[in-house]
Amino acid sequence: MTVWLIGLFTSQVFAIEPQIQQNEIVLPKPSEQHKISTKRVTARLTQSHYHKFKLDDEFAGKIFDRYINMLDSMHMTFLQSDIDELREKYASVLDDQLYEGQLDAAFAIYDLLLKRRYERYKFALSLLDNEPDLKGNDEIENDREKSPFPKTVEEADKLWEARVKYEIINLHLKDKKWPEIKKTLAKRYNLAIKRLTQTKADDILQTYLNSFALEIDPHTNFLSPRSAKAFQESMNLSLEGIGATLSMEDDVTTIKSLVPGAPAARSKRIAVNDKIVGVGQGESGPIEDVIGWRLDDVVDKIKGKKGSKVRLEIEPEKGGKTKIITLVRDKVRIEDSAAKLTVDKIDGKNIAVIKIPTFYIGLTEDVRKLLSEMKGKKAEGLIIDLRENGGGSLTEVIELTGLFIKEGPVVQVRDAFDRIKVHEDPDADTSLYDGKMMVMINRHSASASEIFAAALQDYNRAIIVGQTTFGKGTVQQSRS
């Protein structure tokens, strides 16, 4: 998409300098565990993945291209000469390095990315020295994924001039004046530079191994330990912490919502939009200043074992003195993603609707309870809403299907060795609900949603209503 811009930068006299110098951005080094993980992941993918492929120089070239595009998706950071040099040096050796668990190439490429990003943001800051003359015509490509990399620094400068103009005009359209625009963008670009200093080896490894995994199959992913933990929490709809949703605003962790009944809400001393400026462990652990930290690092400090204590230094939304609040961590259920029942009156009849956002662990048991609740409301029909449901646990979809059929197979799965396993209804000869049913789907209904809808259609248990589904005919398995 091309957007027309109006504007021209006047000449700069005194360029705004970054608050962080380039020598402060240090590339993290991979640990021995990172190398071991790389070797194990490579062995697992080459030996056991359903899609058979050969990890050779040709495939390594594809991994290289995907890695570059994941690092610089808009083609505005690297120069074409960078790509040519990196390709010549590393593209054909990635296969050998993956087999050996070596990460030299992956980290060297990322090192150059950090350097180029710093240079680009430094240049962007320099453009804020003088107010641009917003007259004349210019244009910017919003989507540059298929555009060529800039050949020269001058070409890159033009791309970033257009980007900065675009951001200036957007702020002008919000009735911002130049001094405020300059301050806003200077803060934005300096925060972007600061984030470069917070890069972790786990981040680099996850991006690199995902460039490998996604080249094999669009649904194969590598998760770092932190990402794997978050995935498990989302599948179980529970975590151990204080029950607050956090976001980063102007380098400060801000509370966006509170889970009813969780420790933060129970304290009645924390409110939405309060800021967390410090975190301490236990009754007497030192309070660490967390301003400027990565959000995921702050979250890790706040989460902890059920029953343990965490102390938060809170800056109230309305200002004033900060206060220290001690909370006892507890198990928190993520209710937003749980199945929910509503009963609507349609043409004088009570129709129950069970909305299932995802096939999480424990879903079937939750739906059992909702079906029992539904009976008490004398519903004459049931709608299972799977719109936007991207899937989840294979075990749960098999067990959930069993609530609505008496017996029989639900789905069959073929593995990498051509072995076929038929997954049967685990509760043969029984069904919890045998009344009228409809299943609602759309183009984002995928995986487990498709298995459920197809099974109920095949058994003539439900009318399927909606759009053609996503079409994901594979089953993922988690391996550590």
Predicted features, each with a name:
Residues 1-12:
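Bacterial N-terminal signal peptides
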Residues 13-15, 183, 199:
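Boundary at the C-terminal end of the N-terminal hydrophobic targeting segment
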Residues 17-26, 38-50, 89-93, 187-191:
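Acidic/histidine-rich, surface-exposed loop or edge segments in extracytoplasmic proteins
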Residues 23, 29-30, 46-56, 194-201, ...:
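Cleft-lining beta-strand/loop regions that shape enzyme active-site pockets
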Residues 30-72:
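N-terminal-proximal low-complexity accessory segments that begin disordered
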Residues 36, 40, 58, 62, ...:
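Extracytoplasmic/secreted proteins, especially bacterial periplasmic and envelope-associated proteins
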Residues 53, 69-70, 92, 99, ...:
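PDZ/PDZ-like domain segments forming the peptide/carboxylate-binding groove
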Residues 55-61, 67-140, 193-248, 309-311, ...:
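Extended, small/polar residue-biased N-terminal targeting/export presequences
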